[in-house]
Design a protein with these regions (language model features):
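ATP-dependent carboxylate activation and anion-phosphoryl transfer catalytic cores
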Residues: 13, 238-305
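Conserved N-proximal alpha/beta basic substrate-recognition cap immediately N-terminal to
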Residues: 20-127
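Short, compositionally biased
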Residues: 91-93, 360-361, 378-400
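ATP-grasp fold ATP-binding core
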Residues: 118-119, 141-160, 183-194
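Rossmann-like NAD(P)H-binding beta-loop-alpha module
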Residues: 124-146
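Phosphate-binding site of ATP-dependent enzymes
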Residues: 160-243, 247
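Long, charged amphipathic helices and adjacent flexible linkers at domain junctions
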Residues: 301-320, 391-397
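Cytosolic Rossmann-like ligand/nucleotide-binding regulatory domains
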Residues: 323-385
Length: 400
């Protein structure tokens, strides 16, 4: 049943599961759990949706009828990522709640972009090199800690396009072949401690609801369930749970390797299969997902970046303190001394986001300062603060 107070008596949540596979285990389980909670639910093939755009209106139709669902759970297959994400963007603009965003799905499915975002947020990953020229293979192998190495294409799923190579020549030949076939190639550190095994953490919202260990069979090093790997229940340590939640989307399967120094994120799956993890863990994962949708579908996340860009002359600027060493040790308010009033700003530090931090807070090497206001005035003032002569800065610090 729908939890009391979430929806008025005369209003029922209308839920669409976007999937081309109505007979797949995961799709059927989500449908079953939604119906048990008396939700008006349907499975919609995203390929049947048409998108209408005009200067003042948007619309979506499903097999000729208007799309009239309040929320969607996207189960977008890898081969239709582009179309599926276009659908999600359209629905989002129409106010339809989406369990995962188009941006999140696209980023998670591009292994290069995913590694960049994870690294930017200081989430541990295996050392990774994006290679465009076979002449860089030797240097990439050295960067990754030597042989063997894992070679991957940036677009792949369920272990497809992932290879383990033990020699330089084998690696170079493989990379050359992939590049000739117009594939984007990654060379990645091989984590020997996790050979043939990984941990799948199923994240829903801000918590891990289930986890399992996957093991490859025989000489296979890829542990994917779809490659006939075995699964077993796994009690996830708090350190691994924290990393998984930081890496995940709203609903995601996060694959973790057990490195010598702790967990490493291997991949984030925006449309995780439920069969293996439900069987291994004994957890009703589909039910957890449906309950999450019921609780969250009343609220829609807003992209502030898009909204702020609609105000003429105003926008957001950011400063990486590490790029401007003279700022280190100065109070954050010194960035805005020439402005009539302090702008709205935030400080990103140690994975925390602090809105309007105390102006006396001293800037550190790894800080990121984000500010919003009149772009022309902000740029002028920030340039003055960044490029202020060192002699003036020292004199001011002496006076303080």
């Amino acid at each position: 049943m729908i939890k009391e107070g979430l929806f008025p008596d005369n209003m029922s949540l209308r839920l669409a599961i976007l999937s081309r596979g109505p007979r797949l285990y995961s799709t059927k389980r989500l449908l079953q759990e939604a119906r048990e909670r008396e939700i008006d639910v349907s499975i919609i093939n995203p390929m049947t949706l048409s998108l209408f755009s005009a200067g003042d209106s948007l619309d979506v139709t499903s097999e000729g009828d208007s799309f009239e669902w309040d929320a969607v759970i996207p189960r977008i297959g890898h081969s239709i990522t582009k179309h599926g994400c276009s659908v999600l963007r359209h629905l989002d603009q129409l106010g339809v709640w989406c369990a995962n965003s188009a941006e999140g799905i696209q980023q998670s499915r591009d292994k290069l972009q995913a590694s960049q975002i994870l690294s930017q947020n200081k989430i541990p990953i295996p050392k990774t090199v994006y290679v465009r020229d076979p002449r860089d293979v030797e240097r990439a192998i050295e960067y990754c800690g030597g042989l063997p190495v894992v070679v991957k294409v940036t677009q792949g799923t369920q272990g497809d396009g992932v290879f383990l190579r033990y020699s330089f020549q084998e690696t170079k030949n493989l990379v050359q072949g992939l590049l000739l076939s117009k594939k984007a190639v990654l060379i990645q550190e091989y984590i020997s401690e996790s050979h043939g095994t990984d941990i799948r953490a199923l994240v829903v919202g801000d918590r891990v609801v289930a986890s399992m260990r996957r093991r490859a069979r025989g000489r296979e090093f890829r542990s994917n369930y779809h490659l006939n790997g075995t699964v077993e229940k796994f009690e996830i340590p708090s350190e691994y749970e924290e990393v998984a939640c930081r890496a995940a989307l709203h609903i995601a399967g996060v694959d973790l390797l057990e490195g010598e120094d702790g967990p490493l994120v291997l991949e984030v799956n925006s449309s995780p299969g439920l069969e293996g993890i439900e069987k291994a863990s004994g957890v009703n994962v589909a039910g957890e997902i449906i309950d999450y949708v019921i609780n969250e579908a009343t609220f829609s996340e807003v992209s502030m970046d898009q909204i702020l860009r609609t105000i003429p002359g105003e926008g957001v600027l950011s400063i990486q303190v590490r790029q401007h060493p003279k700022l280190i040790g100065n109070p954050i308010q010194s960035l805005f001394e020439g402005l009539e009033k302090l702008p709205t700003y935030a400080l990103s530090r140690n994975n925390e986001f602090i809105w309007n931090a105390d102006g006396e807070t001293l800037l550190r090497f790894d800080d990121l300062v984000i500010c919003y206001g009149d772009l022309k005035k902000l740029r002028t003032q920030l340039k003055l603060a960044i490029f202020k002569p060192v002699s003036e800065t020292i004199e001011e610090q002496k006076q303080d």
